[in-house]
Amino acid sequence: MSARKYFGTDGIRGRVGQGVISADFVLRLGNALGRVLTQGRSKRPLVLIGKDTRISGYMFEAALEAGLVAAGADVQLIGPMPTPAIAFLTSTLRADAGVVISASHNPHYDNGIKFFSAEGEKLDDATEAAIEAALDEPFHTVESERLGKAIRTRDAIGRYIEFCKASVARGFTLHGLKMVLDCAHGATYHIAPMLFRELGAEVVVIGAAPDGLNINAGVGSTHIDNLAAKVRECGAHLGIAFDGDGDRVLMADDQGNPVDGDDLLYVLARSWQASGRLTGTVVGTLMTNYGLEQALAALHIPFQRAKVGDRYVHQALVEGGGTLGGETSGHLLCLDRASTGDGIVSALQVLEALGRDGQSLREALASLSKVPQKTVNVRLDGGTAKAIVEAVNVQQALQQAQAAVQGRGRAFLRPSGTEPVVRVTVEADDAGLMQDTLDRLSGAVRDAA
């Protein structure tokens, strides 16, 4: 496959008003998608458009709508909704594609576009390539009688809440549980508190007053200390933090200890194994903590690593017949319940597992011992990151580092695909060994750079 011109690993993203994240480009993007979808069809395709709460979403929603309608596609405007909700609604409303306007955990001045197929899954490479090819063609407006129509959907919230509830057992309840929800002033701000209260929880809410500019600002899964402090302050049993578009979830236990995606993956894998729900291999990424790998091995649970990015975790799960995977950042995939990473659904799976096992979150994690891990970004003065990583002296230093932590951790290098940086990561069961190995390996990379 040739290199993508516009698409990254998770759609298109950047600074608003710069490069491709502009109204005129998004207008053409909508038109390109519409032309791809109308090819070979006798009836107008249907496209759903959702967004998070950042202020630029209004501009890009209008641009996408205009481009799609001009190409002859019908549009349903969903408004502010979690990214996974758009994936679900695209499938259940029999749409031909879904589009989300969001930059996930990024600040308000960034935005992006994500796409879903008719099945509610991320677009395949061939479809992305077709959209990119159409983008390089002239904007096209069909004859008046073939123009699409746009309507605003009113029942999307109720549909998605019922979908989330259906992901847990019918008798599942949260009565007696006090929780803190941090909605990152993002797309879950109205849905998550409503859902967890309907299930019986006592809910303390923070980060649920979006103004278009405060999304992810000191709140949400990228600022977990805020959640941890609130849990301690109000004596909650646990806390749950989402990111701006609701596809990530992190937690805090009753003492305010941060709980990341690796921790949650362990809770689910162990519980699902005991209940017979776990199938296939559990999938993490290159960044998944070595301690989790060891803990799963002790439980005889097969584990594999994919490249960083939830699309690669998803690909590995599908290829291996597994249903459970995720990233340290909180992208969790429960493919027997949702077609994509869903923060709310994943949180419900964890709460259901804790209830079934009769444990608090802290108790469920008592048997997991993660190892110290640290990543250093080495900025390059010249040359490409890939060339630096492949340099003979750097490869020799990497082999020495891997030998130093063999059986006790890992050492690896990741060239950035977007900036002149090599990411140096070392983890080991001893903090001193980890730091010494990291210093030596990052020093070798700096010398080569």
From Swiss-Prot:
Catalytic site positions: S104 (phosphoserine intermediate)
Domain of life of the native organism: Bacteria
Free-text comment on the cofactor: Binds 1 Mg(2+) ion per subunit.
Ligand binding (Mg(2+)): S104, D243, D245, D247
Gene responsible for this protein: glmM
PTMs per UniProt: Activated by phosphorylation.
Positions of post-translational Phosphoserine modification: S104
Similarity comment: family membership: Belongs to the phosphohexose mutase family.
Gene Ontology cellular-component terms listed: cytosol
Entry annotated with the keyword Lyase: no
Catalytic activity line of the entry: alpha-D-glucosamine 1-phosphate = D-glucosamine 6-phosphate
Enzyme Commission no: 5.4.2.10
Enzyme class: isomerase
Physiological role: Catalyzes the conversion of glucosamine-6-phosphate to glucosamine-1-phosphate.
Cofactor(s) recorded in Swiss-Prot or TrEMBL: Mg(2+)
Pfam families per record: PGM_PMM_I (PF02878), PGM_PMM_II (PF02879), PGM_PMM_III (PF02880), PGM_PMM_IV (PF00408)
SUPFAM superfamilies attached to this UniProt entry: Phosphoglucomutase, C-terminal domain, Phosphoglucomutase, first 3 domains
PROSITE patterns tied to this protein: PGM_PMM
Gene Ontology MF terms in the entry: magnesium ion binding; phosphoglucosamine mutase activity; phosphomannomutase activity
Keywords recorded for this protein, A-Z: Isomerase, Magnesium, Metal-binding, Phosphoprotein
InterPro entries named among the record's database cross-references: A-D-PHexomutase_a/b/a-I, A-D-PHexomutase_a/b/a-I/II/III, A-D-PHexomutase_a/b/a-II, A-D-PHexomutase_a/b/a-III, A-D-PHexomutase_C, A-D-PHexomutase_C_sf, A-D-PHexomutase_CS, Alpha-D-phosphohexomutase_SF
GO annotation terms (biological process): carbohydrate metabolic process; peptidoglycan biosynthetic process; UDP-N-acetylglucosamine biosynthetic process
UniProt protein name: Phosphoglucosamine mutase
Lineage: Bacteria, Pseudomonadati, Pseudomonadota, Gammaproteobacteria, Lysobacterales
